[in-house]
Each structure stands twice: as C-alpha cells, then as structure tokens.
C-alpha cells in the first residue's frame, strides 16, 4: 500500500493546489521584508524627525536659559539694533539742528553787524561833540588832550567864566564886542590855566 501511494501519480489538480499554496508562502517573505523595511524606514524617519525636533527644542530651550550663548547673541543683536535706532534718532536730530543752525548763525551775524553799526555811529557822534567842545575851549598849541582831559579843561573853563562874571574888571564896551571878548577870555583863561597848573605843581 505504501508503494502504491508513493508511486501513485500526482494529479494535475493536486499539483496546482500545492503550487498555489507554495506561491503565497513564497510571496509572503518579500512582503514581510518590505513591510519591515517600510517600518524601519518609518521608524528611522520618525526618529530622525524627533531628533532634529528635539535638537530644535533643545535649541529653543537653551535660548530661554539666561546664561545661554544664543541668548547673549540675540541680546547683542537686539542691543545693536537698538543702538542703530538711537543712532538713527541722533542723526535725525542732527539733521533738524543742522537745518536750524544756519538760520541762527545768520541771525547772530546780523545782530553783530547791527551792533557794530550802532557802535560806529556812537563813536562818530562822540568824536564830533568833542571836536566842537575843543573849538569852544581855549587851548594851547602844545595841547594834545584826550577826551577825559578835554572834559576836565571844559570844567575849568566854566569855572573861570563864572569868576569873570562875578568880577567888575571888564567894562561894558569890551563886553559888547563878542569877538574881542572871546579873545580876551581866551587869553585870560590861558594865563589862568598856566597859573593854576604852576600852583598845582608847586603845591605838590
């Protein structure tokens, strides 16, 4: 019976069934390998994603730490930006002040010019007044009087005229002629002046 079974020919149907059963078994390992590869690749990709994500998270966490170098760099950058902004603001202020500086300079120049003009006018009028006073006051040829000396001499001349008016030495005829009276007063004042200067020098 054993020989009959072993030697019995296998029917084509049985062969096709056995082949069909073997084919899924043969096809399963590659699919399993592919699935394993896909799973491994997915795990690797997930792990890789988690890795950079973790690194990124660590970078962010490190940035939040007060003593981290990243925060120091960011602080420097922000400080640099702030300094640039302040510098820009300063530049803007400089431009505005620069726009106003020429106007103020022109105003100062105008004020200086006006002050110089007023000073020249005052000096000119003062010189003219002293020149007129020197024409009235009898002076000696050797006189080179300054302004203060001219004022002192004018005060002495007024004192001399007061003394002459108080005295009765001049008659009415001499007083009636203005030119002669002026020459007489001038000569008398010159003599009086010299005597006063001699007496003052002798007293000292």
Curated annotation (Swiss-Prot):
Supply the alphabetized keyword list: Activator, Biological rhythms, Developmental protein, Differentiation, DNA-binding, Myogenesis, Nucleus, Repressor, Transcription, Transcription regulation
GO cellular component terms, A-Z = nucleus
Residue ranges annotated as compositionally biased, kind Basic residues, are 34-43
Compositionally skewed regions (Gly residues) per UniProt: 46-65, 80-101
Region (Sufficient for transactivation activity) residue spans: 163-193
Which GO biological process entries does UniProt record here?
cell differentiation; muscle organ development; negative regulation of DNA-templated transcription; rhythmic process
CDD domains associated with the record? bHLH_TS_TWIST1 (cd11412)
Question: From the record, what ranges are coiled-coil?
Answer: none
Question: Low complexity compositional bias: what residue ranges?
Answer: 1-18
State its location(s): Nucleus
Q: Annotated region Disordered: where?
A: 1-107
What Pfam families is this protein classified in?
HLH (PF00010)
Q: Which domain of life is it from?
A: Eukaryota
Q: Start and end of every bHLH domain? A: 110-161
Identify a single GO molecular function assigned to this protein: RNA polymerase II transcription regulatory region sequence-specific DNA binding
Q: How does it assemble?
A: Efficient DNA binding requires dimerization with another bHLH protein. Homodimer or heterodimer with E proteins such as TCF3. ID1 binds preferentially to TCF3 but does not interact efficiently with TWIST1 so ID1 levels control the amount of TCF3 available to dimerize with TWIST and thus determine the type of dimer formed.
**What does this protein do, in the record's words?**
Acts as a transcriptional regulator. Inhibits myogenesis by sequestrating E proteins, inhibiting trans-activation by MEF2, and inhibiting DNA-binding by MYOD1 through physical interaction. This interaction probably involves the basic domains of both proteins. Also represses expression of pro-inflammatory cytokines such as TNFA and IL1B. Regulates cranial suture patterning and fusion. Activates transcription as a heterodimer with E proteins. Regulates gene expression differentially, depending on dimer composition.
Protein name in the entry: Twist-related protein 1
Which organism does this record belong to? Nomascus concolor
